[in-house]
């Protein structure tokens, strides 16, 4: 039996995912499509729009509604079971899953990439994840990426000047977010853009040609491998989103612009066209630690033209752990992720260095594997100025021999030493 191709639609609230889904259903040209729709509202307006707006019965399109939560969180098991049921029942050529506007795409992709031993379900044997589509609202992306709003704080009230469709506005008003969800809108947008192989810039009629050109270059810097398609009302040739055979989990996991920059040491392809619009990136790399207080102060006053920064940071006050810096627009987070090999026992170091040539090749006689390396992506970046500001946050010559644990610490993390 041929594996059924699966397309996943992601995108923030109001971007046009439901419009795209309706477009797919209305132009299916004989394709037998099973649709899995999920939103986080008590009244599934997305579902009603698909069923009624598309003029299609649930029987015809095998519309499946998972109404108890997000498909990539609380309903992961239901999604597995529902997809298995649909495929085994037969009579379909394609599955399309519309994620809720507050969903991250990676967990959905993982559902189709691994065997679930607990449930005894192996979706990899009966279907294949074919295309990960992310829809971006051209008119709101820049505003939302620079917003400091958390998902749970975003006001869903309707503004008379809001140019989104009535359908999208209704969806937005009815989507609900868990009160404990502390994700920012900027973080979610970046997650959705960085993990896709088709990126649809929708509502291009609401911005100027110059704004569109710049937005396209920003998105290309964030996700350099995805195919970018510009649309009005999410109208796209279905061959670009169905049965494209584009998706590869390993490649998708490594396709984000910040990863490409780090892998190339800051020498990824920077096209003249991109630089014409002021879009650039560079890698900051040092073998000295940051003074945590000074670095934190810099993060809090980071220029707003820095769109994305991500990578590993070495903080003097936490000399035994590597920290992950992840910044998206106005949202910034830093936290410990793993122990430096240099902080482990001599026996552990010997074993790891024997097994990991990449670690051994970068080993410093004094500091071991400790280092800072992160990428900065933005518009009209002054690399020299930013580099000087960051260098000023490093432990200086007068501090290098001091007791780093006595430095002012803004984080106050409680972390046990490596064993």
Model-derived segments and spans:
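C-terminal accessory "lid"/substrate-recognition subdomains
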Residues: 2, 42, 141-142, 147-373, ...
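Nucleotide-state-sensitive switch-loop elements of NTP-binding domains
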Residues: 2-182, 186
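His/Asp/Glu-rich metal/cofactor-coordinating catalytic motifs and the adjacent surface-exposed loops
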Residues: 379
């Amino acid at each position: 039996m041929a594996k059924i191709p699966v397309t996943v639609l992601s995108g923030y609230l109001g971007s046009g995912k439901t419009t795209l889904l309706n477009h797919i259903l209305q132009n299916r040209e004989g394709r037998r499509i099973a649709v899995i729709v999920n939103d986080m509202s008590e009244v599934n307006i997305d579902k009603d729009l698909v069923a009624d707006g598309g003029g299609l019965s649930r029987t015809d399109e095998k519309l499946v509604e998972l109404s108890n939560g997000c498909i990539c969180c609380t309903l992961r098991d239901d999604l597995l079971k529902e997809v298995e049921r649909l495929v085994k029942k037969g009579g379909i050529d394609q599955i399309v899953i519309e994620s809720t506007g507050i969903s991250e795409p990676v967990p959905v992709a993982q559902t189709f990439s691994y065997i679930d031993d607990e449930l005894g379900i192996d979706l990899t044997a009966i279907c294949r994840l074919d295309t990960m589509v992310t829809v971006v609202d051209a008119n709101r992306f820049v505003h939302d990426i620079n917003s400091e709003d958390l998902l749970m704080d975003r006001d869903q009230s309707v503004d008379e000047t809001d140019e989104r469709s009535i359908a999208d506005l209704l969806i937005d008003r009815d989507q609900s977010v868990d009160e404990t969800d502390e994700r920012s809108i900027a973080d979610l947008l970046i997650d959705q853009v960085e993990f896709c192989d088709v990126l649809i810039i929708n509502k291009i009629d609401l911005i100027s040609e110059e704004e569109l050109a710049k937005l396209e270059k920003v998105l290309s810097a964030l996700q350099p491998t995805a195919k970018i398609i510009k649309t009005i009302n999410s109208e796209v040739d279905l061959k670009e989103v169905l049965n494209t055979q584009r998706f590869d989990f390993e490649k998708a996991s490594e396709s984000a612009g910040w990863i490409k920059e780090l892998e190339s040491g800051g020498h990824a392809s920077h096209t003249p066209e991109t630089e014409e619009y002021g879009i650039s990136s560079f890698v900051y790399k040092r073998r000295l630690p940051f003074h945590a207080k000074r670095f934190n102060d810099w993060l809090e006053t980071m220029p707003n033209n820095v769109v994305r920064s991500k990578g590993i940071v070495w903080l003097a006050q936490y000399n035994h752990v590597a920290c992950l810096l992840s910044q998206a627009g106005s949202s910034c987070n830093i936290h410990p992720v793993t122990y430096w090999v240099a902080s482990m026992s001599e026996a552990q170091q010997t074993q790891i260095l024997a097994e990991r040539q990449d670690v051994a090749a970068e080993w410093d006689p004094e500091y071991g594997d400790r280092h800072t390396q992160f990428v900065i992506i933005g518009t009209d970046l002054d690399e020299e100025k930013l580099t000087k500001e960051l260098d000023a946050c490093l432990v200086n010559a007068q501090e290098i021999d001091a007791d780093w644990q006595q430095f002012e610490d803004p984080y106050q993390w409680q972390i046990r030493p490596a064993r």
